[in-house]
């Protein structure tokens, strides 16, 4: 068993429902703690006992591979008893409401609930009904805080900082909770954020979030330190937002030519899952500038840090 982390950071919130409301100090504290877990996860003995005796329930109402497995691994490496619950195996398929599910689970006294839901705001509503800590693993098009944190950790480890960097977020910004959480975090940490998308995939009033807006890749990637691609979220679209996948790739898909508009040492990022040949070319996704696989690695470390920081607030912690 490895020794306890050196960082004594405690998140001053009972839940992690979003990046909104976190201070720069909160974000830095979580990233610093995450750094310790990056190193731990590369060792043979990856176990700590921070969550020993605690119960973690992963409650996913949307399909997930990376996020759910990442949270499961994170909890188990910290010593928690982890239960995975999907909607297909829950009473909600039989008509039970989200609030009834929350009350039922709360009666079992879980310490931490990790929740993903297709409706924006659903995780916050659930958090009001439970006694333990709740982590938002993605709610509709609203927020995905741990994705933004792992993206920030990936950037900081490669660039040494967040402040002053030009980050281009490209693609389906309108339907992306990842985009929203990243914009909030990057603005808080002093980065310069630019969103790049056709008008049909930009939310009305996006400028009010403190971002620059570009409607073509040459303008959007000019001078960018980070190129963050987003997939087309067709499952959230109720109409035709792009003429075709081929035409979308022609104008907004990241290939080697478009990547050349950014700085020569720009990082290529993607939260996954990738639609190769739609928003990103395989040569770029698997190329020397890509840190997409590193993002997955950082995800486990960040989620361990979030679980640890919240657990320190729990009774008898």
UniProtKB/Swiss-Prot annotation:
The protein's enzyme class: transferase
Reaction catalyzed: carbamoyl phosphate + L-aspartate = N-carbamoyl-L-aspartate + phosphate + H(+)
Xref: InterPro entries: Asp/Orn_carbamoyltranf_P-bd, Asp/Orn_carbamoylTrfase, Asp/Orn_carbamoylTrfase_sf, Asp_carbamoyltransf, Asp_carbamoyltransf_Asp/Orn-bd
Assembly, per entry: Heterododecamer (2C3:3R2) of six catalytic PyrB chains organized as two trimers (C3), and six regulatory PyrI chains organized as three dimers (R2).
PANTHER family found in the cross-reference section: ASPARTATE CARBAMOYLTRANSFERASE, ORNITHINE CARBAMOYLTRANSFERASE, MITOCHONDRIAL
Functional summary from the UniProt entry: Catalyzes the condensation of carbamoyl phosphate and aspartate to form carbamoyl aspartate and inorganic phosphate, the committed step in the de novo pyrimidine nucleotide biosynthesis pathway.
Protein name: Aspartate carbamoyltransferase catalytic subunit
Organism: Rhodopseudomonas palustris (strain TIE-1)
């Amino acid at each position: 068993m490895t020794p306890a982390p050196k960082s004594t950071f405690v998140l001053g919130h009972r839940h992690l429902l979003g990046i909104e409301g976190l201070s720069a100090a909160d974000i830095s504290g979580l990233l610093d703690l995450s750094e310790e877990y990056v190193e731990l996860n590369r060792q043979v003995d990856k176990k700590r006992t921070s969550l020993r005796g605690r119960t973690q329930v992963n409650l996913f109402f949307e399909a997930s591979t990376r996020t759910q497995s990442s949270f499961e691994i994170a909890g188990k490496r910290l010593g928690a008893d982890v239960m995975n619950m999907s909607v297909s195996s829950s009473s909600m398929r039989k008509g039970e409401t989200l609030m009834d599910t929350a009350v039922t689970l709360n009666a079992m006294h879980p310490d931490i609930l990790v929740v993903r839901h297709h409706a924006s705001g659903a995780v916050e509503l659930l958090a009001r009904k439970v006694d333990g800590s709740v982590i938002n693993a993605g709610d509709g098009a609203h927020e995905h805080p741990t994705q933004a944190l792992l993206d920030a950790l990936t950037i900081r480890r490669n660039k040494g900082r967040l402040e002053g960097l030009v980050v281009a977020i490209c693609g389906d910004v309108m339907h992306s909770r990842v985009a929203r959480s990243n914009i909030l975090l990057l603005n808080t940490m002093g980065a310069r954020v630019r969103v790049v998308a056709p008008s049909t995939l930009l939310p009305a009033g996006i400028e009010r979030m403190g971002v620059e807006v570009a409607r073509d890749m040459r303008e959007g990637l000019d001078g960018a330190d980070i190129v963050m691609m987003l997939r087309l979220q067709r499952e959230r679209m109720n109409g035709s937002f792009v003429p075709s996948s081929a035409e979308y790739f022609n104008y907004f898909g990241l290939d080697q030519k478009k990547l050349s508009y950014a700085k020569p040492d720009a990082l290529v990022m993607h939260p996954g899952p990738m639609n190769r040949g739609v928003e990103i070319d395989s040569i770029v996704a698997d190329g020397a500038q890509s840190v997409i696989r590193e993002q997955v690695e950082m995800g486990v470390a960040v989620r361990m840090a979030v679980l640890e920081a919240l657990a320190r607030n729990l009774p008898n912690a």
